[in-house]
């Protein structure tokens, strides 16, 4: 009987205090369990919010990072910009800023959106890059931002 009480208390503690803090990455993990050959194509079939979650997971938690997963999001061009700006404004972590900047750099290079002509967006990106804490990421992102400015 004591073991049952202990198990019940333990499960209540874990359920009450630990589970809410755990992040659920089932969507992302299932995506990466599938064959790698058609990942980019498969990602195109997901809605933007899920594409973004999978992209971030593949960039931040996988080695080597799956930077090519920026392509399906970048292909959406102007339709993805409001969502990405919302993500940019809600994130302060250097890695999130880097990931979002990578999508915009992919948009610029693929010409799916004229990033450099969007002065409000460029100002927001510049501000976020300037505020980055990690010097190495800040340098890398500054170069990425300059490539966007130089894109033609």
Placement of each model-derived feature along the sequence:
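Hydrophobic membrane-insertion alpha-helices, especially the h-region
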Residues: 13-16
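Extended repeat-based scaffolds of very large eukaryotic assembly and lipid-transport proteins
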Residues: 22-152
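Bacterial N-terminal signal peptides that target proteins for export
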Residues: 1-11
């Amino acid at each position: 009987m004591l073991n049952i009480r202990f198990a019940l208390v333990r499960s209540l503690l874990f359920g009450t205090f630990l589970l809410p803090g755990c992040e659920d990455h089932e969507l992302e993990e299932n995506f990466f369990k599938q064959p790698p050959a058609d990942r980019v194509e498969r990602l195109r079939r997901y809605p933007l919010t899920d594409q973004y979650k999978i992209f971030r997971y593949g960039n931040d938690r996988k080695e080597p990072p799956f930077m090519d997963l920026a392509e399906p999001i970048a292909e959406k061009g102007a339709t993805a910009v409001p969502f990405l700006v919302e993500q940019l404004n809600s994130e302060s972590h250097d890695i999130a800023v880097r990931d979002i900047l990578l999508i915009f750099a992919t948009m610029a290079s693929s010409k799916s959106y004229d990033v450099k002509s969007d002065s409000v967006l460029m100002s927001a990106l510049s501000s976020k890059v300037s505020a980055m804490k990690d010097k190495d990421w800040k340098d890398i992102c500054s170069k990425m931002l300059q490539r966007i400015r130089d894109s033609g």
